[in-house]
Amino acid sequence: MPENRKLPFLDTKISLFDLQNLEKKGFFKTIFIELLKADKIKNVIPNELQINQTKQELCLKYNLEQLKNKKDNEFIIHNLNKEIYKLASLKKLSLDKFSSQAEKIFKIRKDYHYDQYFYSLLRNKNKSQIYEFYYQIESKESNINDLSKEHSSGSEKEKLGIIGPVNLININSEIAEILKTSKDSTINDPIEMNNEWYLIQRENYKPAIYSEYYENQICLELLEKEIEKEYKNEYLNLMNNKLNF
């Protein structure tokens, strides 16, 4: 007879084989986390502002305004309203638990995760040509954008060499350091990376300012990490048959 495990949140049991099979296919994790979220927010009541903000965020993200004009979408709208309430409840829960930590985390991450940069890029394998372009740009004979359009080796040439907005965490570390220490509209000395020569000019730096947006983002991230950790612990306990529900 197969060995069974009792599942949290449900008055049922599942065989060890089925449990492992669901986990292997990724289904168990999804189901477990959704049940865990539902359990955590069952007594959470978001305020009207949180509900409306969540609704606006979803409408912007998925262009949901068009659904309001279609009668055959009543079922979708009903389920959408339930999803909005659930997400608003999770947001409230995350703020209640982690808002005191959010600003400190923001300050630690700000420079590399949240500040935004635009820059112009010109690159190719010809060192002599890159240095010639560098002198032309420095002397104002030409500009990096026109030169990039004609001579850059990458897809940036389609946008006159302009790249951004970017966060430093998501780009090459050498380019990130140049952007962090440069001034706007100043061409940097040529550098070699990956067998190509690069000219980089920072165009615009937009420092992030702590706001409700970042507070919500950080708190939700911390809640997701907490839930992920709980899932791993619960699954390990299930596999070891140590749960007593």
Predicted feature descriptions by range:
Residues 2-245:
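Peptidyl-prolyl cis-trans isomerase
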